[in-house]
Amino acid sequence: MITETETAFLAVIRAFLTEEKASPAEIQGLTEKQWNHLFVLAAQHSLLSAVYDVVGKTPEFAELPDELRRQVKTQAMQSVLQQVSRTALFLSDEKELEHLGVQPLVMKGIVCRSLYPKPDLRPSGDEDLLISAKDFATVDACFMRKGFVRDKETAMPNGAKDGDTPEEMGYIHPKTGVFYEIHTRLFSTESSAYGYLNRAFSDVFAHPSRVEVQGQSIFTLEETHHLFYLLCHSFKHFLHGGVGIRQICDMVQMIRVYGRKIDWEMFWQLCEEYHMTCFCINLLDIGERYLGFSYEASGAVRAAKKLRPDSEALLIDILDAGSFGKSSAGRIHSANITLYAAETGAEKHIAGGIWKSLVPEASYMKNKYPYAARYPFLLPAAYVQRILKWLGQGEKEQKSSIEVGAGRVELLKKYDMIRTADWKKRGDAHAGRIQREK
């Protein structure tokens, strides 16, 4: 069962999403300690501005200590101002790319914000753009010219040669703090846990959609594919350290706005092909129970597969995870166990996950330890450094990550997200592509 404070937090988010006039009844009677926990939850899930917008003028908030109210208001307002600035800078940069002949498909971020009643209260730390591989050199040169810095070593699949195009590259501007992730693939092809998902998006440039943001038209994924991408993105983060409630809000808002444009037969077919029907049904059940979502009101169509939702365990994990499953060191380190289980379906996922964490593939090590990329003969030293760091964590930290990982593997099984012997290869039915009706 979720706690009284968590129930109140979800009620506040529901009020924000649905623009309720009255303050949520669930916040009445909260103690100062519970209010503190509610604000911590809001910050962990990157929703403090939204929470303040709902509760800031309530009598319950007015009764809290001055210092607490000041801190919450200051952090919320700073977040809004930063988001307003980042949005303006992004729209300018996106327009410049268009002038250079590049048509990026903008995903999540600014597109999801535009679905909210008050977009700037839904912050995003970066903007994600999907581009054609042939446009990468143009985009890279543009950002370098504008003073951006590449955030990390080029993300290359194994076997890549010099001059090949990266699958992902981050760019951060040292003065403004603006951060972009440029993708030529939506998911790492090196990941056997979710790399196969790329097949579902192999023809998205053939049928993009346009959205208006502050009077500027930008290209994005077509609505059905965008909703499925949000689901896949949540799945990916769930396999790592966990997915946050904001990602569920994004899905709910996408359906609220575009429910009657989404091809539901196609969407649920994609879910079936990629083995995500159970996961999606339970995510939307959370939306129905706590976030004011309605299939009927939004024009959404339920899955043909009759599964009885049982989303409480999933919700508890989501609330504990924070925005991207980074609420604790134990949860972050546990990702190796869940990823190993998702990749192999092996029963010995704990031992295998720990081993994979200590001895990952060489390409990962070269990204994580730049000296190993510069001087390949030092790769063994990087492995030793990694193992010694894990051994130095102490028994308590090691035990925590193992317990969290084992518990989350049980969730993968419960929501049908882990390989079993009778699984066929996901997405093979149509080579991962479902042709849209012309």
Go through each PLM region and give its residues.
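Conserved NTP-donor binding/palm subdomain of two-metal-ion nucleotidyltransferases/polymerases, i.e.
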Residues: 1-125, 131-438
